[in-house]
Amino acid sequence: MSTPFYVSPEQLMKDKADYARKGIARGRAVVVLAHADGIAFVSENASRALHKISEIYDRVAFAAVGKYNEFENLRVAGVRYADVRGYSYDRSDVTARGLANAYAQTLGAIFTTESKPYEVELVVAEVGRRPETDQIYRLTYDGSVADEHGFVAMGGSADQISAKLRERWHAGLTLAEALRLAVEALGSDAAAEAAGTGPREIAPDHLEVAVLDRTRERRTFRRLSGPVLAGLLAGTG
């Protein structure tokens, strides 16, 4: 009788974590950063049909990297959660913190009990009435939650991009300044570092950009594209 194959729990969790991290690192990065009038979301994404950045509710938005079908399932579940909570209680009861907790439970359960973890990393953000009340939460494949302040980068080359943001970001940036910083940071990825040529130029039509705009009433989410985005990046918007 052969001896059953045994894998220790520690090794199993390590293998799952390595698998998820590799899947996430293959994707293009997303940058989320606060500015004077709200929160900006920027990703290098040429597709106009497959979004990495989406509205969840009035003042809450979602960004993700990794496997599209997995984070799309989470997005849809988040919209349903928000709709039910807003209808059952009050619209103001739908918060980024509550949604982040719900996602953390889902991701943690999948990572622990399923043979394959989700290859996703998420940001859930909520724009406040004042800059100091903005909330940005980062969730990883195992359900871990981090409360981020000011900015966050996730996906491929996240370390290099975060280093650029750390050097340049400060409170009170205008929207145009925040977008230009985000695009420059996205261009400062591992490929640009290896080539030694400085940040890559990323055309506006290869970007997916959205904002939570605190100056708007009720629904604060809006997408930026075309001449509006090009003008902001050129400093003329």
Swiss-Prot record:
Instruction: Tell me a GO cellular component.
Output: proteasome core complex, alpha-subunit complex
User: Which cysteines bridge via disulfide bonds?
Assistant: none
The Gene Ontology terms for molecular function here are:
threonine-type endopeptidase activity
Any single GO BP term: proteasomal protein catabolic process
Q: How is its activity regulated?
A: The formation of the proteasomal ATPase ARC-20S proteasome complex, likely via the docking of the C-termini of ARC into the intersubunit pockets in the alpha-rings, may trigger opening of the gate for substrate entry. Interconversion between the open-gate and close-gate conformations leads to a dynamic regulation of the 20S proteasome proteolysis activity.
**What UniProt keywords are attached to this protein's entry?**
Cytoplasm, Proteasome
* Quaternary structure and partners: The 20S proteasome core is composed of 14 alpha and 14 beta subunits that assemble into four stacked heptameric rings, resulting in a barrel-shaped structure. The two inner rings, each composed of seven catalytic beta subunits, are sandwiched by two outer rings, each composed of seven alpha subunits. The catalytic chamber with the active sites is on the inside of the barrel. Has a gated structure, the ends of the cylinder being occluded by the N-termini of the alpha-subunits. Is capped by the proteasome-associated ATPase, ARC.
Stated role: Component of the proteasome core, a large protease complex with broad specificity involved in protein degradation.
Similarity-based family: Belongs to the peptidase T1A family.
Q: What is this protein called?
A: Proteasome subunit alpha
Species source reads Kineococcus radiotolerans (strain ATCC BAA-149 / DSM 14245 / SRS30216)
